[in-house]
């Protein structure tokens, strides 16, 4: 009698654990439009690139000020730079973007996610926004992208600001 009761309790416990494990392993995808409507606030906008990709960006601050192009690090987004806006927006035009596969940009049409592909996206964004010269601010992976961009486009840069980044990769 006691053995049947213990077996029943153990069996029920195993079924409950199995159910919870299966439920937690299922990925419930949130529709992209729902995420965008929730998080694309304020100065958020989207640029369409030549290949049809849509890049999430913000263009804020003093439109007549010197331009800061802000690029986030790995697993980051343009929201990483939000705390700087109140301190810099009076004097600078601040352009930030979500790199492909990050933030609200998400997947891109080209399916290219290398550092060179990120650099090409930045070149296209800068061209679309008609920015001639700017200070490139890059954090972590964004710093490496900024450094590589600088090597190929020194004539476009007023300066390079790299935060917590390795220069290899």
Predicted features along the sequence, with ranges:
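Alpha/beta-hydrolase fold catalytic core
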Residues: 2-66, 132
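Short hydrophobic segments within beta-strands
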Residues: 23, 70-74, 137
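Solvent-exposed, non-membrane alpha-helical residues enriched in polar/charged side chains
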Residues: 32, 44-45, 86, 123, ...
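Active-site loop/oxyanion-hole signature of alpha/beta-hydrolase fold enzymes
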Residues: 50, 58, 96-137
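Conserved HGGG/HGGXW glycine-rich cap/lid loop of the alpha/beta-hydrolase fold
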Residues: 53, 60-104
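Short, hydrophobic alpha-helix immediately C-terminal to the catalytic nucleophile
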Residues: 82, 123, 147-151
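Conserved hydrolase catalytic core segment
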Residues: 128-169
């Amino acid at each position: 009698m006691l053995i049947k009761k213990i077996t029943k309790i153990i069996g029920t416990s195993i079924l409950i654990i199995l159910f919870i494990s299966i439920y937690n392993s299922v990925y419930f995808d949130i529709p992209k439009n729902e995420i965008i409507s929730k998080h694309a606030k304020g100065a958020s906008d989207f640029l369409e690139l030549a290949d049809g990709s849509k890049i999430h960006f913000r263009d804020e601050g003093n439109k007549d000020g010197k331009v800061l192009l802000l690029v986030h690090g790995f697993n980051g987004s343009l929201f990483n730079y939000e705390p700087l806006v109140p301190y810099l927006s009076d004097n600078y035009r601040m352009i930030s973007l979500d790199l492909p596969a990050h933030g609200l940009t998400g997947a891109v049409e080209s399916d290219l996610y290398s550092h060179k592909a990120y650099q090409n996206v930045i070149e296209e964004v800068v061209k679309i926004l008609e920015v001639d010269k700017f200070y490139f601010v890059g954090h972590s992976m964004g710093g490496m992208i900024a450094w590589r961009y600088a090597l190929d486009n020194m004539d476009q840069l007023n300066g390079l600001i790299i935060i917590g980044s390795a220069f290899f990769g």
